[in-house]
């Protein structure tokens, strides 16, 4: 009865919006999932070192956020999109407990896809910025991971050949400060982590984006003046920057796109629009396709 009720509600909404292909969707009731006990056993096994009992696992497995991550962990789905009715913390917690971070990554972060009206920047006005969502004050190791993950996100969701700029208020030693030192150290680590990625720093934003300024401030840099991936030194900078671009530049900001998790899990704003949802569905699918290719 409950399953029919859920299906009826979804089908009624689909009819209202003129969606004729809802029959292609698998509609799941967490309370009545045929693999509920199997997933409870899996969760108990994954969390046994934390003292989880099978009774606790059975209670959690009916939570859609936990169930979704368990379905992914078991190989029965490729990604999850949630958050329209949940906090970021509630979305991330089961993802980190069950799916965990990607190999070699300890820092989860969030990228923003910026669709600007300035085709002279990035690739026809398309840029990706990180971190804008998760890690407030990353250290050099974390910042390097953010750079690599943001480059991979740019490849997966925007089809970009990433040209990564590590941003700062200094360009190539023009200013001295411990914050600049962190960016320089992060650049070194990122190059060691992913030698295949084109990356440079530290660069001021104008030096990263404007060819003439890049040539003047960082001669010889292949990234300066041509960056399409912008890595900021802190969450504070990232959050402020993308919102300024969005509001003052009338750019479309798509995201945040969570990165650093072993399989795609994305978090919607509780104020999300229908357009936000379908864009993030497409992005999550692209992340899943890229993850499968990388695993082959």
Q: Where are the language model's segments positioned?
A:
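Short, small-residue-biased leader/transition segments that mark boundaries at the very start
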Residues: 1-6
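Anion-binding alpha/beta catalytic cores of soluble intermediary-metabolism enzymes, centered on
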Residues: 8-224, 229-296
